[in-house]
Amino acid sequence: MDRVVFFFLIAATLLAGSLGSTVISGEVTDGFVNPIRQVVPEENDEQLLNAEHHFTLFKSKYEKTYATQVEHDHRFRVFKANLRRARRNQLLDPSAVHGVTQFSDLTPKEFRRKFLGLKRRGFRLPTDTQTAPILPTSDLPTEFDWREQGAVTPVKNQGMCGSCWSFSAIGALEGAHFLATKELVSLSEQQLVDCDHECDPAQANSCDSGCSGGLMNNAFEYALKAGGLMKEEDYPYTGRDHTACKFDKSKIVASVSNFSVVSSDEDQIAANLVQHGPLAIAINAMWMQTYIGGVSCPYVCSKSQDHGVLLVGFGSSGYAPIRLKEKPYWIIKNSWGAMWGEHGYYKICRGPHNMCGMDTMVSTVAAVHTSPK
């Protein structure tokens, strides 16, 4: 069935390209017109005016300015290309909503370089990595959300720094610390950016390196060796690296007791999420540049991960693509600010196919209570 639907969508994409004169009114999201249904591959004067209008709205909403007219014109061309890309993404991911985001003036290459930072190349688990025990799954709830339990801090923003790995690791440790102490504390990502240079000795180019990328398990290993993490307010995030480490052991508020890798079985992922708190995971972010909301369940998605995020929950019936029965989904906290996605969150379908590689690199961490001296 999925293959039939996929080929139907490919045909629809080609047909849409041939019906360039068809214009459907846009959708409105938080007062901002989503023009994805007004964009066609070939521009006429009216469509060009629409693109210029939406580019003006885009610049206003996201406070975008460009140093020169040449740069402005280049970004407008990129913006138009991303409108067409969002329209194609909508056809191939119909249960989500795709359109204009804060990244709509970036090429895919620029987007990956500036906002994705997972060091995934050649990834394999170290031989001494602890594996999470198999948990019972017969009594799993159909829906669960750690936000409702008070275990998740507000959405943060990594800025133009490839430090997603640090936000993923910190989010998991914030949740683990909450489970251990019943206290929700915002911890310091900047401590990891500045101070964590942990490496997997079995792999070249596997060291955590601030805005140039890292791995969540390396970050947990660093936290174990360093003794713990400081509060965000004591070591605030700047989104810059190559600065001196300002770690103060006297201000540690959360420490790692252990961490482990979770099985790629989705029931085991759900069981570990419910029992051990939010999980640090990796995902392929190719569909996230144009994502606005809904449940993303694309018919094609690479399983090569390039982005670290935080798994905080799951739902039972979030979408019904092509009139099929409603399907379950995962709830993911991202680190691109609350203006992206569903107030900073991403929903992606659950199932046996390792959607966008999200089942491959999943870690759980446990915390111990540490009082400031």
From Swiss-Prot:
Localization, UniProt: Lytic vacuole
Keyword hit for Transport: no
The keyword Methyltransferase is assigned to this record: no
Record GO biological process: proteolysis
Disulfide bonds: 161-211, 195-245, 301-356
N-terminal signal peptide: 1-20
GO molecular function: cysteine-type peptidase activity
Signals that turn on the gene: By drought stress.
EC annotation from Swiss-Prot or TrEMBL: 3.4.22.-
Keywords: Disulfide bond, Glycoprotein, Hydrolase, Protease, Signal, Thiol protease, Vacuole, Zymogen
Residues forming the catalytic site: 164, 307, 334
Source domain of life: Eukaryota
Pfam family, one: Inhibitor_I29
Entry similarity comment: Belongs to the peptidase C1 family.
The protein's name in its UniProt record: Probable cysteine protease RD19C
Organism: Arabidopsis thaliana
Phylogenetic lineage: Eukaryota, Viridiplantae, Streptophyta, Embryophyta, Tracheophyta
